[in-house]
């Protein structure tokens, strides 16, 4: 609903001999049919210091990423990583999840990797690619390559973890954070689920 800038005042007779005044606001749509709300508050109006402090505490060590790696019956490797979403993110920030080689990477000659953690450190260390490169060019095992790549994240002041599978079906899930929800299932159906 929109109000006209010019409001009319009307007089009414409530009882004989007594006059009361009431204000009547005319409602109309401005040209083009768009409404302008003079009291629409900016988003900052609704944010309190207490709410922001609680959000900051909750997000401090929360990475909110989900990832998957897979080896199919034909020997193809795949990796997928999804970020924790838009809430609380800085405008213009690019995380590691969508960057191939940082938070996600798959190479049929080596391994598939999905990572979660401090995105800036994962980007600078190209963690997912580094894991595969250590296997291809140095002959490192999956577990050794993943741990070494994660050490580079720590050197940059970051924390996080990886899930990875190589072309032989070996799985590695190292992390240097307090914990990381993770699980795997092998070709025989054996499952592994862990947090710490």
Residue ranges and their predicted role:
Residues 1-196:
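N-terminal nucleophile
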């Amino acid at each position: 609903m929109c109000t006209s800038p010019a409001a009319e005042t009307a007089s009414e007779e409530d009882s004989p001999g007594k006059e009361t005044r009431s204000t009547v606001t005319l409602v109309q749509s401005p040209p083009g049919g768009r409404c302008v709300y003079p009291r629409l508050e900016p988003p900052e109006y609704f944010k309190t210091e207490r709410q922001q402090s609680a959000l900051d505490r909750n997000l401090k060590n929360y990475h909110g990423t989900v990832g998957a790696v897979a080896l199919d019956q034909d020997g193809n490797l795949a990796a997928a990583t999804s970020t924790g979403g838009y809430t609380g993110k800085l405008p213009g920030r690019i995380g590691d999840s969508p960057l191939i080689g940082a938070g996600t990477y798959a190479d049929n000659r080596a391994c598939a990797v999905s990572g979660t953690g401090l995105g800036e450190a994962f980007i600078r260390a190209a963690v997912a690619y580094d894991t595969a490169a250590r296997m291809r060019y140095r002959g490192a095992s999956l577990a050794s390559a993943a741990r070494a790549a994660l050490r580079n994240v720590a050197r940059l002041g970051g924390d996080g973890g990886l899930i990875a599978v190589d072309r032989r079906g070996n799985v590695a899930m190292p992390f240097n954070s307090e914990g990381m929800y993770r699980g795997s299932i092998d070709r025989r159906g054996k499952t592994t689920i862990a947090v710490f």
